[in-house]
Amino acid sequence: MKISPSLMCMDLLKFKEQIEFIDNHADYFHIDIMDGHFVPNLTLSPFFVSQVKKLASKPLDCHLMVTRPQDYIAQLARAGADFITLHPETINGQAFRLIDEIRRHGMKVGLILNPETPVEAMKYYIHKADKITVMTVDPGFAGQPFIPEMLDKVAELKAWREREGLEYEIEVDGSCNQATYEKLMAAGADVFIVGTSGLFNHAENIDEAWRIMTAQILAAKSEVQPHAKTA
């Protein structure tokens, strides 16, 4: 199981300490960039990405919750992003061009589905994705309740990947925590984006918070594995 902490949930007063710890323990950094239009919130920025890059060696995954993603690609490449993750709703009419532009800048491509957006919405370019993320909450704010219907979408993406012989990772964003780990693993998730309930609220000290999170994930995995063997 891969872990991608959401930096909009971190303690910014402990920026250096937490970035360095995450870099030593996680698989990705998840960086939410919102414009106040596509979602009603403003969060992180290309400048923030550039500051994380000074301390980090693990891949920086920039989730663009913006109306005009084309305005951010070159900026984020200069800032040091490794992935750019796009919503189908914002790239219709230019999906292939933007995906090609991301690759020309040497970055990988992520696609992300809002709860109401079907997998079918990206069927003509799903094969171009390195990673596909399922939003299991409505986008824009941390700490929202899990939407259980999204388990079917995770399973659908796993089945699609197997049927078409694709290699994208399946990632989950929203309320990844002790209550949902086992269900998400069983459905086929490969990567958890962890935020307030999954990591940062466990303890003030990130080392202790990480220990608690890891124990919870291992416990969930131990429950999933026996079922996988008998399937």
Identify the role of each PLM range.
Residues 102, 185, 199-231:
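C-terminal helical cap(s) of enzyme catalytic domains, especially alpha/beta-barrels
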Residues 17-19, 70-78, 117-129, 175-192:
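Catalytic cores of alpha/beta
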Residues 42-62, 101-110, 150-170, 212-224:
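Alpha-helix-loop-beta-strand connector modules within alpha/beta enzyme cores
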Residues 3-7, 29-31, 52, 60-64, ...:
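Hydrophobic faces of well-ordered beta-strands that scaffold small-molecule active sites
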Residues 15, 22, 32, 76, ...:
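Conserved, mostly hydrophobic/aromatic
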Residues 84-92, 133-145, 187-209:
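Glycine-rich phosphate-binding active-site loops on the catalytic face of alpha/beta enzymes
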Residues 35-43, 47, 115, 123-155, ...:
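Glycine/Thr-rich beta-alpha phosphate-binding loop at enzyme active sites
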Residues 31-101:
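N-terminal active-site wall of soluble small-molecule enzyme domains
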